[in-house]
Amino acid sequence: MKRFDYLTPVGFVLGTIIIVIGIISGSGVSGFRSFLDLTSFFIVTGGLCAAVFISFPPSELKKAPSVLKQAFIRQEDNVKDLVKTFVSLSDHARKHGLLSLDDQAREIKDPFLKKGLLLAIDGWDEETIRLVMDSEIAAMEERHRKGRRVFEKAGEFAPAWGMIGTLVGLVLMLKNLNDPHMLGPNMAIALLTTLYGSLLANMVFNPIAAKLEEKTESEIFIKQVMVEGIIGVQSGKNPRNLESQLVVFSSREEWQKQPKQVKTKKGSVHEA
């Protein structure tokens, strides 16, 4: 079940409040205006957008809004309910045969679980089922990585463009040393671009990338539990034994101890 992840906007609002309070407590409300500079903001955001446009093809950039939306949604998968589902399927398969699960499998809404069960019902062996399902997981992980990479690179570019703006401001300041009226505005550009770049990186792009990565790990975890459940049903494992296995396996700490299959660039697979 998908629900609104309120912690994402709460984090943004909380970070903004902390910055604003820090500024006001040091210089008052009137001093807050000193931290607003359109030129500095334009240098950072404009340069950041240019760098991102150069780095990614249009097809990846078009997906960015939908990927960003995932940071505001949390998927609530109840592992206990999932275990109960597999226990029920296993019990039914042992009593009436694996083929009797066909109707139940086709009614399942989760496409990953549905596909795995249909493979088992169609008579595919354990090794093939595991290979197909692991390939599905790897493909999903790669899609998520590509979507997340836009925000990861933006988090890298933002501080760099902040530094570029700082250099621009310093050059302008040194060029106008004879004009005292220009020292303040140019110094503001030099310092505020660094501030804006750091804020965009550490309060927007990097946290979003981190949240997207955590969501990917959670989804992989759920799918790994599904794979083990499907294999258990396919092999005719005793429902109680399958339940005991999945209860242990469904602990994230235990799952992280399992050897992971790592796919290299050449296509070979080895355990890490």
Curated annotation (Swiss-Prot):
Superkingdom of this protein's organism: Bacteria
Family matches, as Pfam families: MotA_ExbB
Cytoplasmic side: 209-272
Claim: Ribonucleoprotein is one of the keywords in the record: no
Claim: RNA-binding is one of the keywords in the record: no
Gene Ontology annotations of biological process type: bacterial-type flagellum-dependent swarming motility; chemotaxis
Membrane topology label: Multi-pass membrane protein
Compartments it resides in: Cell membrane
GO CC entries: plasma membrane
Keyword list, A-Z: Cell membrane, Membrane, Transmembrane, Transmembrane helix, Transport
InterPro entries: Flag_MotA_CS, MotA-like, MotA_ExbB_proton_chnl
Transmembrane segments: 9-29, 38-58, 154-174, 188-208
Annotated family: Belongs to the MotA family.
NCBIfam families: PRK06926.1 (NF005383)
Physiological role: May be involved in some transport function.
Name this protein carries in UniProt: Uncharacterized protein YtxD
